[in-house]
A protein has these predicted regions:
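Short, small/polar-rich loop/turn modules that mediate ligand/substrate recognition or access, typified
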Residues: 130, 171, 176, 231-233
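Short C-terminal tail/terminal secondary-structure segment
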Residues: 232-252
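Substrate-binding pocket helix/loop in short-chain dehydrogenase/reductase
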Residues: 94-95, 102-107, 190, 201
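Alpha-helical segment proximal to the catalytic Tyr-Lys
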Residues: 123, 168-169, 229
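Conserved glycine-rich cofactor-binding loop
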Residues: 9, 16-18
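The beta1-alpha1 cofactor-binding region of Rossmann-like NAD(H)/NADP(H)-dependent oxidoreductases
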Residues: 58-68, 100, 215
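Active-site helix of classical SDR
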Residues: 118, 155, 163
């Protein structure tokens, strides 16, 4: 039986849709007090009402906005025990055609946004005495590659470099830093890639199905428990075995 996280203060960036919404829902169902952030006030308000959580419109690529999130968490939640740095985007752009703006957008949200979010929340996480930072990375970049996502893959691999060094620096404050690496998870964004993409990816997964947002939420929940207190600088891959086969024939 895991220690309850009921009552703990949890911030989920990018929490209005997709994986972030799933993470927020899992924590809320387990009694945590949750603040979600994102750029769309409309999406945030709808999700907050559905899940019974607080929200604040903010852009993780902005240092000032990240500091507002920390201040809001202090006011509404009384602090931060868990930061789920989840905000991320994955627009398609082939390397030959990729613009400087494309690169800045993806790295700004996925990598810079992760660093700024953690940095802004550090004082509150340290004050918690059992602070947890949980990054949503990806199998794409750290383990695999996919055409059109060179900037995305670079941002996600960069998150893990940040995670490992941050885990060392923050250990003295009792803060752990870990990451969940989702494979293909059924979200609005993934559905938008089309039926052919989904069918192709499903056929490459040994479990022959896409993951759910709950699968990621429960991995994050575990890393937030007292039982995971001695785990830091590590990753949990949640992909149905997608990265395991040596060739397509291995799962045929």
């Amino acid at each position: 039986m895991f220690t309850s996280i009921a009552g703990r203060a949890v911030v989920v960036t990018g929490g209005s849709r997709g994986i972030g919404k799933g993470i927020a829902a899992v924590f809320a169902r387990n009694g945590a007090r949750v603040l979600i952030t994102g750029r769309s006030e409309q999406d945030l308000a709808a999700t907050a009402e559905e899940l019974g959580v607080s929200y604040l419109a903010a852009d993780v690529a902005s240092k000032a906005d990240c500091e507002l999130v920390a201040g809001c968490a202090a006011d509404r939640l009384g602090g931060i025990d868990v930061l789920c740095a989840n905000a991320g985007i994955f627009p398609d752009a082939r390397l030959a055609d990729m613009t400087e703006e494309d690169i800045d957008r993806v790295l700004g949200t996925n990598l810079k946004g992760t660093i700024l979010s953690v940095q802004a929340c550090l004082p509150l996480l340290a004050r918690s005495g059992r602070g947890r930072v949980i990054l949503t990375s990806s199998i794409t970049g750290p383990i695999t590659g996919y055409p059109g996502w060179t900037h995305y893959g670079a941002s996600k691999a960069g998150q893990l470099g940040f995670m490992r060094t941050a885990a060392i620096e923050l250990a003295r404050d009792g803060i752990t830093v870990n990451a969940v690496l989702p494979g293909n998870i059924l979200t609005e964004g993934l559905a938008g890639l089309g039926e052919d993409y989904i069918a192709g990816m499903t056929s490459a997964i040994p479990m022959r199905k896409l993951g759910s947002v709950d699968d990621i939420g429960y991995a994050a929940l575990f890393l937030a428990t007292d039982e995971a207190a001695y785990i830091t600088g590590q990753t949990i891959v949640v992909d149905g075995g997608q990265v395991l086969p040596e060739s397509p024939e291995a799962v045929s």
